[in-house]
A protein has these predicted regions:
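Active-site-adjacent structural elements that line small-molecule/cofactor binding pockets in enzymes
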Residues: 1-185
Length: 185
């Protein structure tokens, strides 16, 4: 966190040659641990959260106050069958279930080491990769706004993607889910 604190201060101090923007570009830090969240509260314009439950969003909002940005990236599975949805989510989240930094963040939301074992507990999977019909997923999205997110980005998990152990992401976008959840024009 000390390095990030120094980095943000250095970025803020940069003098740009040439035309200056009317408003400086915001600095939004990615981090879900307490130290980086504190740096975001102290020095940044916002915080970027990934795979975090609404409880973490609410905690971040309390820490950052009402005016800073909170971007929540939510992995979703458009499926109404629990077994199918969880199988798809587990394939996509396998990489993150191994990372101690995520374990610590999820522990702050009430999860235990048993929740990270064997592909993740149903409770953890359902929380960090919500699944359901488009109507159910819209309610989940709203719950992130209600918890304090200023922006919610959907990252739907494609059921046919070939997630590889040890790799962070898949290559296929689930366009039908994005279209089903898009606001009406």
């Amino acid at each position: 966190a000390r390095k990030m604190r120094n980095y943000v201060k250095a970025v803020r101090a940069v003098e740009v040659d040439g035309v200056k923007a009317a408003t400086p570009a915001p600095i939004v830090l990615a981090g879900h641990g307490p130290k980086l969240m504190q740096v975001a509260a102290d020095l940044a314009d916002g915080l970027f959260l990934y795979l975090q439950p609404t409880a973490q969003v609410a905690a971040a909002r309390k820490l950052l106050g009402p005016h800073k940005q909170i971007h929540a990236v939510v992995r979703t599975v458009r499926a109404t069958d629990a077994a199918t949805a969880r199988r798809v989510a587990r394939a996509a989240l396998g990489f993150y279930l191994q990372l101690p930094a995520y374990h610590r963040a999820w522990a702050a939301a009430g999860f235990t080491p048993a929740d990270y074992a064997d592909g993740g507990s149903d409770r953890l999977i359902d929380t960090v990769a919500p699944w359901g019909s488009p109507a159910q997923l819209k309610a989940v999205i709203q719950s992130y706004f209600d918890a304090g997110a200023s922006h919610v980005s959907l990252y739907p998990i494609h059921p046919d993607d070939d997630y590889q152990p040890g790799k962070a992401g898949g290559l296929l976008w689930d366009w039908p889910t994005l279209e089903a959840l898009a606001p009406a024009a």
